């Protein structure tokens, strides 16, 4: 089983050029799957049948996995078994026709304009704070994913024309604009970046000079949010969701927001129309003479 997996990781890394972060996620899911199979004395991929796949999902749910994680586990297994079919090691993919439990629609949480101002109202001159402010400004200004921001190099950014070249999901490249506040914050960071003794061309580096990790970015944002007095937990998703919601509220251009976010399907972007409708409903309730509630 492990031999086939090792060939699969090489395939994803070399031929598909998948990001290390995505590969790590798949590894985690398939490692957990192998443990479940071992409990059933299944030690070969040819022994995996549709009923075994359903058992994996049921056992994973019993272990506490939520709908989103179950979908990810099934997706990782489906992709791997498809690889084995392509390699001629399996005749059919046993996941065919099996769906993960439907996920409930959870609207992303976002910050309002006042909270964003509160978040970014910090002019500390400490080099690490200058770096973190640049990360915050760029994430909110461009709506980048955590993995996209972490993967930026010095040549990815152009502060003169205020554009950043991003490698998104599926190794797709897109160019995203950013605002003057983000441009200024990045220029300030570039002035002090050398103090961190950078070891490569990464735009954002740790205090050890290495490319800053996903986890470090998450921890720094969380710390920054607490320090700025935000009541809610700050994370990269919240910055991206806030960017999308505020752009949609201001422009109502769903297609443009789709391009900026790097969504391949418009349906993925449409969740923000629910948020936008909530905003419009509030405006309607406050403004329309036949909607105002009696006092």
Swiss-Prot record:
Cell cycle as UniProt keyword: yes
Any one Gene Ontology BP term: cell division
Gene3D superfamilies registered for this protein in UniProt: 1.10.150.130, Intergrase catalytic core
One GO cellular component term noted in the UniProt record for this chain: cytoplasm
InterPro entries registered for this protein in UniProt: CB, DNA_brk_join_enz, Integrase-like_cat_sf, Integrase_catalytic, Integrase_recombinase_N, Integrase_SAM-like_N, Recomb_XerC, Tyrosine_recombinase_XerC/XerD
Localization terms from the record: Cytoplasm
Assembly and oligomerization: Forms a cyclic heterotetrameric complex composed of two molecules of XerC and two molecules of XerD.
Protein name: Tyrosine recombinase XerC
């Amino acid at each position: 089983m492990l031999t086939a997996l090792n060939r699969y990781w090489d395939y994803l890394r070399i031929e598909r050029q998948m990001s290390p972060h995505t590969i790590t996620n798949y590894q985690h899911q398939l490692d957990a799957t192998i443990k479940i199979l071992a409990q059933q004395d299944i030690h070969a991929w040819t022994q995996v049948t549709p009923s075994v796949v359903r058992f994996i999902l049921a056992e994973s749910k019993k272990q506490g996995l939520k709908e989103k994680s179950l979908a990810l586990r099934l997706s990782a297994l489906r992709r791997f078994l498809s690889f084995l079919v392509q390699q001629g090691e399996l005749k059919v993919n046993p996941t065919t026709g099996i769906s993960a439990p439907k996920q409930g629609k959870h609207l992303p949480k976002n910050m309002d304009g006042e909270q964003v101002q509160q978040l970014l109202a910090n002019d500390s001159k400490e080099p690490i704070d200058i770096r973190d402010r640049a990360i915050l400004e760029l994430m909110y200004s461009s709506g980048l994913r955590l993995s996209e921001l972490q993967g930026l190099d010095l040549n990815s950014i152009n502060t003169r024309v205020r554009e950043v070249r991003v490698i998104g999901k599926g190794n797709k490249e897109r160019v995203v604009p950013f605002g003057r506040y983000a441009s200024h914050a990045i220029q300030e960071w570039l002035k002090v970046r050398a103090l961190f003794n950078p070891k490569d061309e990464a735009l954002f580096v740790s205090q050890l000079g290495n490319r800053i990790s996903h986890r470090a970015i998450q921890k720094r944002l969380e710390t920054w949010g607490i320090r700025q007095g935000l009541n809610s937990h700050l994370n990269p998703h919240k910055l991206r969701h806030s960017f999308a919601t505020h752009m949609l509220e201001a422009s109502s251009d769903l297609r443009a927001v789709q391009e900026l976010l790097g969504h391949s399907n418009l349906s993925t972007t449409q969740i923000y129309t629910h948020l936008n409708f909530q905003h419009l409903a509030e405006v309607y309730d406050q403004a329309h003479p036949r909607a105002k509630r009696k006092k």
